[in-house]
Swiss-Prot record:
CDD domains: ATP-synt_F1_beta_C (cd18110), ATP-synt_F1_beta_N (cd18115), F1-ATPase_beta_CD (cd01133). It is an enzyme of class 7 (translocase). The gene is atpD. ATP binds at residues 152-159. It is found in: Cell inner membrane. It catalyses: ATP + H2O + 4 H(+)(in) = ADP + phosphate + 5 H(+)(out). Its EC number is 7.1.2.2. This is ATP synthase subunit beta. GO terms for cellular component: plasma membrane; proton-transporting ATP synthase complex. Belongs to the ATPase alpha/beta chains family.
Length: 462
């Protein structure tokens, strides 16, 4: 336990001088011990810059810090509570409770910096995780123990989709979940907490928040805090769900820290260590022989450009990508998932079975043909199409509408009750549309319903 003194403060980056023979190691946690504003502030060592001086990022606001304040080295990295005592609680990046419900009462604490499981410890699984959301289960099915990205620009429904997934899986799947709110709105965090409370699944979820208004150090590390809690559940032999909203803010916090530490920026101003930082996080999110982590990550797409370095780096790590499209949202079809852009490694006849595979590909073929015909329709009108193409367009429009679905978490806004659709029902419905069994029904009947039986009922009332 060595002591040092603050020598320089530049925003969230602080330089601290220690005796030459007691310089802290990189990632060691330091704490301000001098009385006054800033007391108890935790800092994490990022660089040793010679002469006994270490450069740190603050894990909280640097307001009130001044040169000469005394800092003590804890001799270890940031340690956070893990285990069942974290369930139903909201914590910050350091694992301190922020829900005013008293101490966590944990039995052990783990470091947030841990090595990824070794190659021989990892395991793969082809089991599917049913989400109850038609478009996802059909076109981009999730694997148990896999990684899923929800890609979308601003305001197309990433957080709502994520909340619906958590609700459906928590209720139907009865496992534990960890939710890491990385640099998102405090209001959303609050809504999410109350949503979990009303669904009676709060006692199965650990919540870790590092919001938009917090310093970059918090936002950069909060994903690791949540992941550490998920790893503990996995190592106890459980199947755990790990949700991150939003992985882009993790990258952005890294960009801010990188600039403050004086590193040269790379493409589009991102940090030069972008791929490495992403890899360090993503490689730990994996399934081992003892348990699995299934992760769902929301990925903000800057300016709707999927080739931006941040989303492009994330793509490489995922098993399934759910792409949310502004064009589909503009049609009023929610969830606004693009069935032609979304992919999954599980959509393979050997994994999902021939029936599911052919139905999904059939749906995509019809929608792709409709997309090609749209130009002709815009210029010449529907009358110039062949009978076969007219039928394709009619079915495509029904499929488009049938891909929409009322959500449980959006009942407050839509006024229609949420629907959970089992995979078998989803396949049966789309097969029927492709075979022409519902050609006589009006397309409005397919909008915002659950199973195909509801479509038939709705059509009778129209």
């Amino acid at each position: 336990m060595s002591n040092g003194f603050i020598v320089q403060i530049i925003g969230a980056v602080v330089d601290i001088e220690f005796p030459q023979d007691a310089v802290p190691q990189v990632y060691d946690a330091l704490k301000v011990v001098s009385e006054g504003q800033g007391q108890g502030l935790v800092l994490e060592v990022q660089q040793q810059i010679g002469g006994g001086v270490v450069r740190c990022i603050t894990m909280g606001s640097s307001d009130g810090l001044r040169r000469g304040l005394e800092v003590v080295n804890s001799g270890k990295s940031i340690q956070v509570p893990v285990g069942v005592s974290t369930l139903g609680r909201i914590m910050n990046v350091l694992g301190d409770p922020i829900d005013e419900k008293g101490p966590i009462g944990e039995e052990e604490r783990w470091s947030i910096h841990r090595a990824a499981p070794s190659y021989e410890d990892q395991s793969n699984s082809n089991d599917l995780l049913e989400t109850g959301i038609k478009v996802i289960d059909l076109v981009c099915p999730f694997a148990k123990g896999g990684k899923v990205g929800l890609f979308g620009g601003a305001g197309v429904g990433k957080t709502v989709n994520m909340m619906e997934l958590i609700r459906n899986i928590a209720i139907e799947h009865s496992g534990y979940s960890v939710f890491a709110g990385v640099g998102e709105r405090t209001r959303e965090g609050n809504d999410f907490y109350h949503e979990m409370m009303e669904s009676n699944v709060l006692d199965k979820v650990s919540l870790v928040y590092g919001q938009m208004n917090e310093p970059p150090g918090n936002r950069l590390r909060v994903a690791l805090t949540g992941l550490t809690m998920a790893e503990k559940f996995r190592d106890e032999g459980r199947d755990v769900l790990f949700f991150v909203d939003n992985i882009y803010r993790y990258t952005l916090a890294g960009t801010e820290v990188s600039a403050l530490l004086g590193r040269m920026p790379s493409a589009v101003g991102y940090q030069p260590t972008l791929a490495e930082e992403m890899g360090v996080l993503q490689e730990r999110i994996t399934s081992t022989k003892t348990g699995s982590i299934t992760s769902v990550q929301a990925v903000y797409v800057p300016a709707d450009d999927l080739t931006d370095p941040s989303p492009a780096t994330t793509f490489a790590h995922l098993d399934a990508t759910v792409v949310l499209s502004r064009q589909i949202a503009a049609l009023g079809i929610y969830p606004a998932v693009d069935p032609l852009d979304s992919t999954s490694r599980q959509l393979d006849p050997l994994v999902v079975g021939k029936e599911h595979y052919e139905t999904a590909r059939g749906v995509q073929t019809v929608l792709q043909r409709y997309k090609e015909l749209k130009d002709i329709i815009a210029i010449l009108g529907m009358d110039e199409l062949s009978e076969e193409d007219k039928l394709t367009v009619a079915r495509a429009r029904k499929i488009e509408r049938f891909l929409s679905q009322p959500f449980f978490v959006a009942e407050v806004f839509t006024g229609s009750p949420g629907k959970y659709v089992p995979l078998k029902e989803t396949i049966r419905g789309f097969q029927g549309i492709l075979k022409g069994e519902y050609d006589d029904l009006p397309e409005q009947a397919f909008y915002m319903v659950g199973s195909i039986d509801e479509v038939v009922e709705k059509a009778k009332k129209l």
